[in-house]
Regions:
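Short coil-to-beta-strand transition motifs
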Residues: 73-82, 128-132
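Glycine-rich active-site loops that engage anionic ligands at enzyme catalytic sites
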Residues: 84-121, 125
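Well-ordered alpha/beta subsegment
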Residues: 17, 116-155
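Residues immediately within or flanking Cys/His clusters that coordinate Zn2+
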Residues: 44-47, 61
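Cys/His-rich microdomains that often coordinate metals
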Residues: 56-57, 70-71
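A broadly conserved sequence feature marking short terminus-proximal activation segments
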Residues: 2-45, 154-155
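Short, cysteine/histidine-rich loop/knuckle motifs that typically chelate Zn2+
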Residues: 49-52, 63-69
Length: 155
């Protein structure tokens, strides 16, 4: 339920407090389409390489985020990498990939120049260390989303 906040002596609503459920549809576009199809159909993580600065971007995008050059060279990345940082999520919120508590991490996949966010599994939070090697665990049934990778586990 929404509640309008009316200032004293005025009739102008300056803010509204409440919760809105917003439904939307996001179009993948050319780069995301191939990225998610490759994960779904081939268990492959694809990046895109910049011809000017050489950066390998993940997820793929039409322009390099470092030098703003158009990019179109696809490269297959490893499904292994190094854990750069992480946090333990304790509070529930809409759209979570799993029930809390869980470990949310930023991973630098081998061959990529951009961090890949995902969850960690098969490990307790007390045992997680930055720099540790991790590997993707693929979902049995893949649908063309980030959840095609169930989680990353220690190598």
């Amino acid at each position: 339920m929404l509640e309008a906040a009316t200032p004293p002596g005025g009739d102008i609503v300056k803010s509204v407090t409440g919760t809105l459920d917003v439904k939307y549809r996001f179009s993948y576009g050319e780069q995301y389409d191939r990225f998610f199809r490759e994960m779904r159909d081939n268990k492959r993580i694809m990046g895109i390489a910049c011809p000017k600065c050489g950066a390998v971007l993940l997820p793929p995008r039409p322009y390099c985020g470092f030098c703003y050059t158009p990019v179109d060279e696809w490269v297959e990345l490893s499904d292994e990498g190094a854990l750069l940082t992480y946090t333990v999520v304790h509070l529930p919120f809409i759209g979570q990939p799993t029930e809390p508590p869980y470990i949310y991490a930023f991973i630098m996949l081998d061959g990529a120049d951009v961090q890949f966010p995902h969850i960690l599994g098969e490990i307790e939070a007390a045992d997680v260390r930055t720099g540790m090697r991790v590997k993707a665990v693929w979902a049995e049934e893949r649908k063309g989303t980030l959840h095609d990778i169930k989680y990353f586990r220690p190598v």
